[in-house]
From Swiss-Prot:
The keyword DNA-binding appears for this protein: no
Site feature Interaction with substrate tRNA, where: 106, 128
Residue numbers spanned by region Interaction with substrate tRNA: 40-43
Protein name per the record: tRNA dimethylallyltransferase 2
Positions bound to substrate: 17-22
Record field: catalytic activity: adenosine(37) in tRNA + dimethylallyl diphosphate = N(6)-dimethylallyladenosine(37) in tRNA + diphosphate
Quaternary structure and interacting proteins, as annotated: Monomer.
Keywords of the record: ATP-binding, Magnesium, Nucleotide-binding, Transferase, tRNA processing
GO BP of this protein: tRNA modification
Amino acid sequence: MTGSIEKPRLIVVMGPTAVGKTAAAIRLAKQWGGEIISADSMQVYRHMDIGTAKPTPDQQCRVPHHLIDIVNPDESFNAACFMERARAVIAELHKRGKKIIVVGGTGLYIRAVLGGLFDGPAADEALRRHYFTILEREGKAGLYGMLKARDRRAAAIIHPNDTTRMIRALEVLDLTGVSIVEQQQEHRFAQRPYRVLKIGLRCSRSVLYERIEARTEEMLAQGFLDEVRQLLDMGFHEGLRPMQALGYRQMVGFLKGELDLDEAVDQLKRETRRYAKRQLTWFGADPEIRWFEPGNEEEILRYAGRFLRGE
């Protein structure tokens, strides 16, 4: 079968933050002369390097990376934008005969590329006003508590600060009587534009938490606080969505005098652990993922090699 007819083959490396996805993807890419597509909702932003744990300049020189540093923090970007750009890159790499490795921890972005986005029912303005009223009256915690009581599966993968997704999940549940998570899972099987091998990385909770601790301390040593200060000086204000992201929100809190540094760091570590738990919940619902310990490089290479050879 010719390359122009055969569906592109994608190796997708996924898992929680700090587990070692970047190193694994680079090892795979170097083994077969492949290129990497970053599926990370924060690494798309310029000037946000340390807090997003972007591959280093040296790593990006060793293996070509795509969809890193493509928009400014004050530009709108979402899963639909990512899907469009990623699919264009995949088409180009496939045309050039390159092996394609997708790596990241943003489950929604990965799902969008592999199977498209679930549109769901049209927005209901009356319902949205209802939930915005609840948000104004009871705050994010009240809205999240309502979601958790009505749709625990959605609450397990939606961040308690992500009011947009919380309201959409409640709206879909009201309109259809079915969890948005269940509908998304059904939708992902409808589109199969690629042949995909899903590799998941995970380790014990204690080891992962140690990695998160070390990653946080390393970020601070690399100048994370200065990075956030520079972003504010450049005019990227704290209300921007990327500036509300994990890590940046805590550092802004310190710079504004709302938190002392120890409080900010402790909060960052705690929230990162919670984020990792949500990532594992999201990926754990996908039966197509084969899981490996991060250190099992040779086993991962053999598994990926069989896929690339069509075995």
